[in-house]
């Protein structure tokens, strides 16, 4: 995947949104580029940007399978809460099946 120019997204910081916390959710099929885009966005936005990656939590940290009652969900919820309190921008990325992760999306509102 080619390097993407996310410079225009940095303008969000100077157009009256400086003190607003933001949540970016990237969902999609496996191999669609979610993680690549999420990492590029985090780099473009710079410090105080938190990236929550479903695969990192589920596969790397907890080593559990995805599913309706995955133990990854409570940790992701806690990370979302932490990010809302402590980061200007939170990026959540993963396949994030809406039937299994609806509680996580409820935290976004």
Features from the language model and the residues they span:
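Walker A/P-loop
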Residues: 35
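Pre-Walker A (Motif I) flank of P-loop NTPase domains
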Residues: 20-23, 87-88
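Short, Lys/Arg-enriched N-terminal segments with co-localized hydrophobic residues
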Residues: 5-19
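Glycine-rich phosphate-binding loop used to anchor ATP phosphates in small-molecule kinases
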Residues: 71-109
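P-loop (Walker A) phosphate-binding loop of NTP-binding proteins
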Residues: 29
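ATP-binding Walker
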Residues: 32
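Conserved substrate/cofactor phosphate-moiety recognition/catalytic segment
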Residues: 38-86
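Hydrophobic anchor at the beta1->P-loop junction of P-loop NTPases
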Residues: 26
